[in-house]
Amino acid sequence: MERNPNPNNLPVELNRTSLYLGLLVVFTTGILFSSYFFN
């Protein structure tokens, strides 16, 4: 079980995490705005 620090692995994971966080924020704001407009 050896961990080889790959410099190309960290930005991909960080970009994927930020992408999922962005999608989650857009999804939650979309639900809030839709509930606000349909209320």
Swiss-Prot record:
Keyword Manganese: no
One GO cellular component term noted in the UniProt record for this chain: plasma membrane-derived thylakoid membrane
Record-annotated membrane-spanning stretches: 18-38
Keywords associated with the record: Membrane, Photosynthesis, Photosystem II, Reaction center, Thylakoid, Transmembrane, Transmembrane helix
Highest taxon of the lineage: Bacteria
Biological-process GO terms, alphabetical: photosynthesis
Intracellular or extracellular location(s): Cellular thylakoid membrane
Membrane topology (UniProt): Single-pass membrane protein
Coiled coil region boundaries: none
Principal subcellular localization: membrane
Similarity section: Belongs to the PsbL family.
Free-text function comment from the UniProt entry: One of the components of the core complex of photosystem II (PSII). PSII is a light-driven water:plastoquinone oxidoreductase that uses light energy to abstract electrons from H(2)O, generating O(2) and a proton gradient subsequently used for ATP formation. It consists of a core antenna complex that captures photons, and an electron transfer chain that converts photonic excitation into a charge separation. This subunit is found at the monomer-monomer interface and is required for correct PSII assembly and/or dimerization.
Quaternary structure, from the entry: PSII is composed of 1 copy each of membrane proteins PsbA, PsbB, PsbC, PsbD, PsbE, PsbF, PsbH, PsbI, PsbJ, PsbK, PsbL, PsbM, PsbT, PsbX, PsbY, PsbZ, Psb30/Ycf12, peripheral proteins PsbO, CyanoQ (PsbQ), PsbU, PsbV and a large number of cofactors. It forms dimeric complexes.
Name of this chain's protein: Photosystem II reaction center protein L
Source species of the chain: Synechococcus sp. (strain WH7803)
